[in-house]
Regions:
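Extreme N-terminal starter segment of soluble prokaryotic enzymes
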Residues: 1-5
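Cofactor-binding loop segments of dinucleotide-utilizing enzymes, especially the Rossmann-like FAD-
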Residues: 7-9, 34, 91, 179
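Short N-terminal binding/cap micro-motifs at the start of the first secondary-structure element
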Residues: 12-17
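Flexible gly/pro-rich beta->alpha loop and the following alpha-helix that scaffold active-site loops
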Residues: 20-87
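Conserved catalytic-core motifs of eukaryotic protein kinase domains, centered on the activation segment
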Residues: 61-64, 98, 108
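Gly/Ala-rich beta-loop-alpha elbow adjacent to hydrolase catalytic centers
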Residues: 88, 92, 97, 101
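Pocket-forming structural segment of enzyme catalytic cores
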Residues: 100-186
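Acyltransferase
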Residues: 183-252
Length: 252
């Protein structure tokens, strides 16, 4: 078994705490940085998992500054088709959706920034990862785009009032999270520094950072076990009875 493939789409959004949790679970990782001219691998042979992170590029139409995104979409289609455990966060969740004919648009509700709660949906009760997540887990939000239509066959796992598609599963081994679980203080501080979104919202950067830092402990309490369970799935340590089978999705 090789290393889990991590696609890092932005130097300001790396694995950070998520990487620490996966290391604790003994999941080896290899990071691909397309923004630094790393080629997006076309082959997923021997990959136990695929993780696609967030960042400034947008999945709303072609992004000329991120010409690698179509290749990432193709990789996600292949991962889902071949039942490789997959996790998309932020932009990664958007790409998981658009790769399978979902829709991502600029959010009509406006930007969502800072700590928030999301609500689990009924389907989460039988999900191999979300079944252990609290009913209203703490998360961090930092986005202006949102998934407005899930791919056909996707299972909604978490929602909020103004942003209804907060988490979903596609097939039986691929998850998309609109929100962020990987952040630490330094990452949030970097995002806040000079943020035009915060300026538009008239939110002081230090206030937003402090609010995010206050919930980091709660986020770790919920999402560290989630990450460890994802790693266990990737390493083949979860019994098949924990994983609901679905019909295969079309893809290459």
């Amino acid at each position: 078994m090789g290393s889990a493939l991590v696609i890092e789409n932005d130097p300001t959004d790396d694995l950070r705490r998520l990487g620490e949790w996966l290391a604790e679970a003994n999941l080896p990782i290899e990071v691909c940085r397309p923004y630094a001219d790393d080629p997006v691998p076309a082959d997923l042979a021997d990959r136990p998992a695929v993780i696609v992170l967030g960042g400034r590029p947008s999945a709303v139409g072609p992004d000329p500054a991120a010409g690698w995104l179509p290749a990432v979409e193709g990789l996600l289609r292949k991962a889902v088709r071949h039942r490789i455990p997959t996790l998309g966060i932020g932009l990664g969740a958007h790409l998981l959706a658009t790769a399978h004919a979902g829709t991502v648009e600029r959010s009509a509700a406006g930007p969502e920034i800072g700590p928030a709660l999301v609500g689990k949906r009924d389907a989460a009760a039988t999900d191999p990862l979300f079944r252990y997540v609290p009913l209203a887990p703490d998360v961090l939000q930092w986005h202006v785009d949102e998934i407005t239509e899930l791919p056909h066959g996707a299972v909604l796992l978490a929602a909020s009032t103004h942003y209804p598609h907060q988490a979903f599963r596609l097939g039986d081994r691929a998850w998309g999270l609109q929100f962020h679980i990987e952040c630490d203080r330094d990452m949030v501080s970097t995002w806040a520094a000079g943020s035009t979104i915060l300026t538009e919202l008239r939110l002081p950067a230090d206030v937003v950072v402090d609010a995010c830092v206050e919930v980091l402990g709660d986020i770790e309490e919920v999402w560290q076990p989630f990450a460890v369970r994802f790693a266990a799935l990737a390493l083949g340590q979860l019994p098949d009875s924990d994983i609901p089978r679905t019909l295969p999705l079309l893809g290459s």
